[in-house]
């Protein structure tokens, strides 16, 4: 009888069940490779022999050595405050923050090299598609370093890295991240140099009294000019060129100097180990299985699983069900000590309970709340409605789930005569609105219509009352009291541009009602302009115009400025004399005619023709400032006539004429959803 030879995979499987690691040499697998099957004991033995992160990655310099092994059991008690460094990476958009974060995680063995996912800390699909960071993310690393201060003794440091967004809309995420840090890496592109968001982020860190380590990235590029960038940093921020680090996150060049600089230049956390517990709540998101997961920074004291804690803002009490670090995924450690950053699970069922910037402390202890930080101020408002008017419940569910993970969006229910029931949402900026819309569609499958973005205005009346308007339809066209003054929000805009585009940009800013406050040259090729501008002029399409004029070379950033008095009017769009609330807008009187003409022309293109003539008008109160006429469809009522008396034809035509008059008098114009889609598309 011929012998039957068991397949190699089956042999490996049986060996693993017996608790012996499989060699699998003939199958092409390494002797200590990790099989996906087998008993727990066998799997543990295999893991002990060959760590999944790819073995040790020893990288040494004169005074430091990086340990390449990912710790199986993390004991946070081994890391007192003097062995902890909390730092963040801040930079302009696309200057390489997330790529540098990847290299540092690989360097310390936190993730394996070539993990198959570039920008590891960019978790959201929208972040990967757009190549931007939207949510700040935290990761803990461990690093062996021989410090001169300890006489060359090798010490293991705990480093908390926070990767922050670079876009102006998400500067709130940056400010939250900096609250948990003692220092930052200020990253600058070696080719592009200092940009607008570089300036804004530097002053955020400077005002927070953080240690700043300047790093010039992308020095491997052909057009890199590190010396030129050093001189820019010296001129704008008075940074010593000798303190600047040079690196390429893409190739790893100069990377070994960054973490030693973090340890040497950034101070340890200042908290007190023996004091009562105080934690700063940095961020929160909703998990379907564990409820709300909070990211926290322990300022004073110690937090352990089973502790009872209380919120300083809501005075609600919770029990710590799970506590740990992000290594880089959630890793349960059972404890967090002074100066450490991690996560807690408390059984909260809604992110509304987790107020960002709140102080958490042990129940029945008396502590002084931490300063926290200002709540996010919403700069742009827009209506969000279901594409299918009857699908409100599905939209409501999607919005509720998404806002669980994005607490910076404000939500209020509203009703529109044209679009049905929806929500009035407040956003940090246009990109934030775009990202919210995209996440609704991608993550929750909701098809929505987003109305034209508006900004919050203040209207003052003769009786002394003040009305803040976020939705133009809510402003009465004929108020009972006389309007005394109107105020609109403004921003302080910073533009950094090649000097040949300065004239064109000055013209653009003047057309947008901007007032110049500063004009200076950074070097021989680039200038910095500062303007105070109305926020409405910025949120419509200013950024696109700026990029178009400068061929994409200019960078733009803005920060909040006080309200200013302005000559504002409400512009209504009428169809056959009936106002369409979803198309109402508030604009400056000098631009009302232009805006009204543009809207009327667009409506004429997207509306279906009716059996009667449709008048499309733009009006300020009772005064019509623009008009377009949509001609009626003509039905051939004479088709059934084959000659004969002309009076018969005349009678049919007169009857049709009377019918059209009657239809025009009582007929309503239905605006199809497709028309709203094309008309209200952002940027139109």
Swiss-Prot record:
Catalyses which reaction(s): GTP + H2O = GDP + phosphate + H(+)
Group of enzyme by EC: hydrolase
Key words of the record: GTP-binding, Hydrolase, Membrane, Mitochondrion, Mitochondrion inner membrane, Nucleotide-binding, Protein biosynthesis
Pfam families noted in UniProt: EFG_C (PF00679), GTP_EFTU (PF00009), GTP_EFTU_D2 (PF03144), LepA_C (PF06421)
Transmembrane segment boundaries: none
Keyword Mitochondrion: yes
Cited InterPro entries: EF-4 (IPR006297), EFG_III/V (IPR035647), EFG_V-like (IPR000640), EFTu-like_2 (IPR004161), G_TR_CS (IPR031157), LepA_C_sf (IPR038363), LepA_CTD (IPR013842), LepA_IV (IPR035654)
Matching Gene3D superfamilies: 3.30.70.240, Elongation factor 4, C-terminal domain, Elongation Factor G (Translational Gtpase), domain 3, P-loop containing nucleotide triphosphate hydrolases, Translation factors
Residues that hold GTP according to the record: 91-98, 163-167, 217-220
One GO location term (cellular component): mitochondrial inner membrane
Membrane topology, as annotated: Peripheral membrane protein
Top-level division of the source organism's lineage: Eukaryota
GO BP, sorted A to Z: positive regulation of translation; translation
tr-type G domain segment(s): 82-270
CDD domains recorded: EF4_II, EF4_III, LepA, lepA_C
Compartment(s) where it occurs, according to its Swiss-Prot or TrEMBL record: Mitochondrion inner membrane
Enzyme Commission number(s) from the entry: 3.6.5.-
Alphabetical list of SUPFAM superfamilies matching this protein: EF-G C-terminal domain-like (SSF54980), P-loop containing nucleoside triphosphate hydrolases (SSF52540)
GO molecular function terms attached to this record: GTP binding; GTPase activity; ribosome binding
NCBIfam families in UniProt: lepA (TIGR01393), small_GTP (TIGR00231)
Family recorded in the similarity comment: Belongs to the TRAFAC class translation factor GTPase superfamily. Classic translation factor GTPase family. LepA subfamily.
Function, in words: Promotes mitochondrial protein synthesis. May act as a fidelity factor of the translation reaction, by catalyzing a one-codon backward translocation of tRNAs on improperly translocated ribosomes. Binds to mitochondrial ribosomes in a GTP-dependent manner.
Additional facts recorded: This protein may be expected to contain an N-terminal transit peptide but none has been predicted.
PANTHER family: TRANSLATION FACTOR GUF1, MITOCHONDRIAL, TRANSLATION FACTOR GUF1-RELATED
HAMAP family, per the entry: LepA (MF_00071)
This protein's name: Translation factor GUF1 homolog, mitochondrial
Organism: Physcomitrium patens (Spreading-leaved earth moss)
């Amino acid at each position: 009888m011929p012998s039957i030879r068991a397949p190699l995979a089956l042999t490996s499987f049986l060996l693993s069940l017996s608790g012996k690691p499989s060699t699998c040499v003939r199958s092409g697998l390494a002797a200590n490779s990790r099989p996906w099957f087998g008993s727990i004991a066998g799997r543990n033995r295999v893991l002990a022999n060959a760590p999944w992160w790819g073995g040790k990655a020893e990288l040494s310099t004169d005074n430091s050595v990086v340990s390449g092994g990912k710790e199986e059991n993390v004991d946070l008690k081994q890391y007192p405050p003097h062995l902890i460094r909390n730092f963040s990476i801040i930079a302009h958009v696309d200057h390489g923050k997330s790529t540098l974060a990847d290299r540092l995680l690989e360097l310390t063995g936190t993730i394996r090299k070539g993990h198959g996912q570039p920008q590891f800390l960019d978790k959201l699909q929208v972040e990967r598609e757009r190549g931007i960071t939207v949510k700040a993310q935290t990761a803990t690393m461990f690093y062996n370093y021989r410090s001169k201060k300890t006489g060359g003794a090798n010490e293991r440091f705990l480093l908390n890295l926070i990767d922050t967004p670079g876009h102006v809309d998400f500067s709130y995420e940056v400010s939250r991240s900096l609250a948990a840090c003692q220092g930052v890496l200020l990253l600058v592109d070696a080719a592009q140099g200092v940009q607008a968001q570089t300036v804004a982020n530097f002053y955020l860190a400077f005002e927070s009294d953080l240690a700043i380590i300047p790093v010039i990235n992308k020095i491997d590029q052909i057009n890199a000019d590190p010396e030129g960038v050093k001189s820019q940093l010296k001129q704008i921020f008075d940074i010593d060129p000798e303190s600047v680090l040079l690196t390429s996150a893409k190739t790893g060049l100069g990377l070994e100097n960054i973490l030693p600089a973090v340890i040497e230049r950034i101070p340890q956390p200042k908290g007190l180990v023996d004091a009562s517990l105080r934690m700063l709540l940095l961020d929160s998101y909703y998990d379907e299985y564990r409820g709300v997961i909070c990211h926290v920074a322990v300022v004073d004291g110690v937090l352990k699983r089973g502790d009872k804690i209380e919120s300083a803002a809501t005075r609600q009490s919770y029990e710590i069900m799970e506590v740990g670090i992000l290594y880089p995924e959630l890793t349960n450690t059972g404890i967090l000590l002074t100066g450490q950053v991690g996560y807690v699970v408390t059984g909260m069922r809604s992110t509304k309970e987790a107020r960002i910037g709140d102080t958490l402390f042990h129940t029945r202890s008396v502590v002084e709340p931490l300063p926290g930080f200002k709540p996010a101020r919403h700069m742009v408002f827009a209506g969000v409605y279901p594409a299918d008017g009857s699908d409100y419940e599905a939209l409501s569910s999607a919005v509720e789930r998404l806002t669980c993970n994005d607490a910076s969006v404000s939500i209020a229910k509203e009703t529109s005569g044209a679009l049905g029931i929806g929500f009035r949402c407040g956003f940090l900026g246009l990109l934030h609105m775009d990202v919210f819309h995209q996440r609704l569609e991608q993550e929750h499958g909701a098809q929505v219509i987003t109305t034209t973005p508006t900004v919050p205005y203040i209207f003052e009346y003769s009786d002394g009352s003040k009305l803040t308007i976020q939705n133009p339809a809510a402003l009465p066209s004929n108020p009972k009291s006389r309007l005394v003054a109107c105020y609109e929000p403004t921003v302080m805009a910073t533009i950094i541009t090649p000097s040949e585009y300065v004239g064109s940009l000055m013209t653009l800013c003047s057309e947008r009602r901007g007032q110049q406050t500063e004009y200076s040259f950074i070097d021989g090729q680039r200038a910095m302009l500062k303007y105070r501008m109305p926020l409405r002029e910025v949120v419509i399409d200013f950024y696109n115009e700026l990029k178009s004029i400068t061929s994409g070379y200019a960078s733009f950033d803005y920060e909040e400025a006080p309200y200013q008095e302005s000559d504002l009017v409400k512009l209504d769009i009428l169809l056959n004399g009936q106002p369409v609330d979803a198309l109402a807008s508030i604009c400056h009187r000098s631009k009302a005619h232009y805006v009204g003409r543009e809207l009327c022309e667009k409506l004429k293109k997207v509306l279906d023709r009716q059996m009667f003539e449709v008048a499309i008008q733009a009006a300020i109160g009772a005064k019509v400032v623009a008009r377009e006429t949509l001609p009626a469809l003509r039905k051939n009522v004479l088709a059934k006539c084959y000659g004969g008396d002309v009076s018969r034809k005349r009678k049919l035509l007169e009857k049709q004429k009377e019918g059209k008059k009657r239809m025009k008098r009582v007929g309503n114009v239905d605006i199809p959803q497709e028309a709203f889609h094309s008309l209200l598309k952002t940027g139109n």
